[in-house]
Amino acid sequence: MTSTGIRLHAPAPGWAIAADVVVVGSGVAGLTAALRCESAGLRTVVVTKARLDDGSTRWAQGGVAAALGEGDTPEQHLDDTLVAGAGLCDQDAVRILVTEGPDAVRRLIATGAHFDESTEGGLALTREGGHHRRRIAHAGGDATGAEISRALVEAVRARGLRTVENALVLDLLTDAEGRTAGVTLHVMGEGQHDGVGAVHAPAVVLATGGMGQVFSATTNPSVSTGDGVALALRAGAEVSDLEFVQFHPTVLFLGSDAEGQQPLVSEAVRGEGAHLVDADGVRFMQGRHELAELAPRDIVAKAITRRMQEHGADHMYLDARHFGRTMWEHRFPTILAACRAHGIDPVTEPVPVAPAAHYASGGVRTDAHGRTTVPGLYACGEVACTGVHGANRLASNSLLEGLVYAERIAADIAAAHTAGTLHARVPAPLPHPDHSQHPRHPLLPPEARLTIQRIMTEGAGVLRSADSLARAADRLHGLHAEAREALHEHGKTSEPGVDTWEATNLLCVARVLVAAAARREETRGCHWREDHADRDDTTWRRHVVVRLNPDRTLAVHTTDTPEFPPTVHGAQPTHRPQEQ
């Protein structure tokens, strides 16, 4: 693949670091990859957008799923994952996940993560939506992500890995042959490095997390603006399955006008026996699915949305009053505190909940070793699309995917280094085409962020149709056209900065999401088309893949099968440009 030539308008790098590998992101995927690369003797640099312990991992409540319990097997975990994925999982990718997962969790424990234990002394395992067995290991009751983050951050600091915090990655650097040569980044604030710089490395691992901030209401932190997906698109990489955005069924409802990050009410609350009820106290999941409240997330989110439509309501309720105070305080202290902070006491009253954007099942298309279609560029965690999640991620498979595929990436880079194919001398990067005072590509103003979020929530949220998606595409195109006209006709664009770079990245990923959702004319997993209400395996048991063209149009195509072929050296299909 060749780069699009599109870059974020930014000053020229004023400093540079050399490394063997640069890992972008400090969640479970990024720090696991970094620790394994460092252990293999690779000079490793970690770049992260905020502090090392920020990002989505620390917000994960439920836990990490793996076949660790008595009587459970990887095959059973595989079956549950395939069912949740609604016919679009790559079975080989899932088999890797479930067979390598248990040992990956054990290595995480050896790194220093402390999981809750049962009274018998083994791991305390709970059950969540879509799982037929108790196989979710958790920590601190409902603070699993925070504990995993703590353990990994401590390990990174103990080993003295070089880290660059408060740094927004801008673009991929490549050499004349199109090989990865590092990244450009902007460090916020003053420190050892500040302003725009570069990390030169022959291998780049994207572990930048999700893009939930493309919607008005999300469980994702404010830093989740799709930076990794946007960078990969500009670098010429393929993105797959971006239409499959998982809306978590039970997010604390803070009012119809609430925007930004909102508190998650973990699946594990339902796993322990909480009931979904309407305003009349009627349970509405019984009879809709054999697992009732523990059905896969897409089914529960749709059921809540339908009930809201039927009742003209903007939320439903999660009733766990029967847990009692002691269970709430010991098993779900984080959720209890979040509810009480907003004036709700789940011990004595039902909790108002509604679906909100939670997880991108799609992302940068990779093979089984995390390799993208750009040589030397890897991706893992939520930013990646490995084929594991299909059309809908199974609860608590995300942390496991981050662990397993990060280790596979590190092994692949280490093997290339040992074989001498990871070129020892960092190639000289090509001159950045957008460093001049006269940028070629516009930046959106900061206020465009809210506009994009509202466009996406209205047109590409839980419920979608050809009309809603067409309106969203037109409005997104209008934002870009307005910025492009201001630049080309008047020589004006927004000043380079974190707010304008984030808004521009959000527009990039929003356009791709809408294009993919419009192309998939069926309902499957967490993609719900009102105008195509049925699942169509004959036509649509395949992936929607998108590339960014140099003229900023989108090349959209579908694969022939649900399986993921090798990404780096495969034959390229013919693409049909599509202006969005």
From Swiss-Prot:
Cofactor binding summary note: Binds 1 FAD per subunit.
Catalyzed reactions: L-aspartate + O2 = iminosuccinate + H2O2
Name by which UniProt lists this protein: L-aspartate oxidase
Family classification: Belongs to the FAD-dependent oxidoreductase 2 family. NadB subfamily.
Chief place of localization: cytoplasm
UniProt-annotated site: Important in orienting the L-aspartate substrate, residues: 128
Subcellular location: Cytoplasm
Example of a GO MF term: steroid dehydrogenase activity, acting on the CH-CH group of donors
